[in-house]
Every structure is written in structure tokens, then in C-alpha cells.
Amino acid sequence: MISFKDNITFVIVTFNSQQVITKCIESINSNNRIIIIENSKNYLIKKSIENKFKNVEVVIAGENLGYGCGNNLGISKVKTQYAFILNPDAYIDENTIQELETAQLLLKDKFSIIAPNFYNNYGNFSKKNYIDISRKVLEVDFVKGFAMLLNLKNINFRSIFDEKIFLFLEEIDLCKRIKNQNGKIYLVSDSKIYHSEKKGSGSSFEVELCRNWHWMWSLYYYNLKHSGKFKAYTIAFNKFFLSIIKILFSLIVFNKKKYLMNRYRLSGLVYSILNKPSWIRPENIKI
């Protein structure tokens, strides 16, 4: 019988993340297969990583697929029962997998997702959502997407992630759909993960504009999908007029960066309301 730790394949979606990916890979046991989906046409990354790490397969997507679609591509190549979704700017602790295995045994494999605990107050979970089954394992409504173990045997979606979402709320959407089917999601408090937000895909101003555009697009799409038109429209109405006010103010004070940021936020919201795809990419942005 295959052991728990040997039944895990790591899936990492990258976008020119060579400056941080090495530490991530080195934190993973060399006996585990790692599938990296590189959301670019950079074949030099594939050659460099595969020459250095024999347990790694780098798939060049040829375009920027985004987080959800990229992970779906990686998961489609997984042959083990478990897929560990990991961001390139995250790395695991020496006890991470051992503590997840302890939780897996405690839960008797009756879970859809278990996730390690971010060492600095992982996420913003409300205590009212916790169901204490032990001091170390907590049932939650959602976990953060930068590190989570999927039990593929217990997830029955044709596409794990919603591929209409390019960035933001993809894991929240997945957790919501799992909970709607009475699936179980747990946070393992003693299983630690370390994460440096936003380092994985760069931090240029163009990237920030892209992130703000997609935040507004995804927020409206998620609310419409899971909460209905009334809540989606109510939130959109407030966001729309707040963005208009901020745009006007930034013009008055001649703050170009704030103007562009709020203009892109407004654009993302409008595109989502009009049911247009989440098309914008950092390389499309011209300042």
C-alpha cells in the first residue's frame, strides 16, 4: 500500500517566477513528483529547472492561463490520490506533510481539502465557522489557495477550479462549491507553511494594475454566482460610485498612479457586470 507522503503530487503554477521557485522546490521531498505549469513561453525556465531537479516536470503553457486554469492543467497530469497546490513563493516546513498525515488518519480520509497553517495567523477565519474536532484540526469554510492538499478521490468536479476566474477568489469559489456538496475542509494548525505574498508573479506597477482589475472582476463574478443578483448588484453599486469618486479626486490632485489604479478597478467591475471575460494581462497594459 502506498504511503500518504508518497501519494502526493505537488502542483505549482508560475509566471516567470524563477527568482523564488528554487526555495519552494528545495523545501519539498525529492521523492515527490512536482508539476510546474509555467504561464509563459519561456522554455529556458523549463530547461534550467528540469536539469537541476529530477523530480520536476515543467509544462510550458505558452500563454498566461491564470491560477485556476493553470492548476487545472497541472491536476490533469496528477496520477496520485492527492494534489498539493502550492504557490511558487511559498515553502513547506519539515513537519508540514507529517502533520497533514496525522490529520488524514484522524479524519479517516473523509475530507476534500486539508491545508497547513500559515505561520503568521493563517487567513482571516471567523471562529464561528470552526467546528473543533481536536485541538489541532479545525473544520473551516475555506482555506487560502497558496497551500492546500486536495483529496481528488473526494472532489467530483469536472474542472476543479472555475476557469472563468483568472485571478482572485478561485480557491474561495472551489471551497464554496465543495461545501455546497457537503464536502469537508480542514485547517491543520500544527502543519506550517511559509508564504511571501505577491513575490511569485512580480510586483511592477503593471502587475498591480492587473491585480486590481481582476479583483473587481472576480468579486462581482463570485457574488453573482454564489449570492445572486441582489447582493452582487448592491456591492457593485457601492464599488462603482466609490471608484468614480476616487478617480475624480485623483484627477484633482494630479495623482496619476491613483487615477490609473482606480480606473482599472472600475474597468474590471464594468467588464464583469457586462458578462465579459477576464481578459486583461500584465503584458497588455500600456501606461
Predicted regions and their residues:
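Short, well-formed alpha-helical segments that are part of the catalytic scaffolds
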Residues: 12-30
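Glycine-rich, basic loop-to-helix element that forms the pyrophosphate-binding segment
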Residues: 60-78
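Short aromatic/hydrophobic "clamp" motif used to bind/position activated sugar donors
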Residues: 83
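Conserved donor NDP-sugar-binding/catalytic core segment of glycosyltransferases
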Residues: 94-126
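Non-catalytic, C-terminal membrane-associated alpha-helical segments of glycosyltransferases
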Residues: 210-218, 229-287
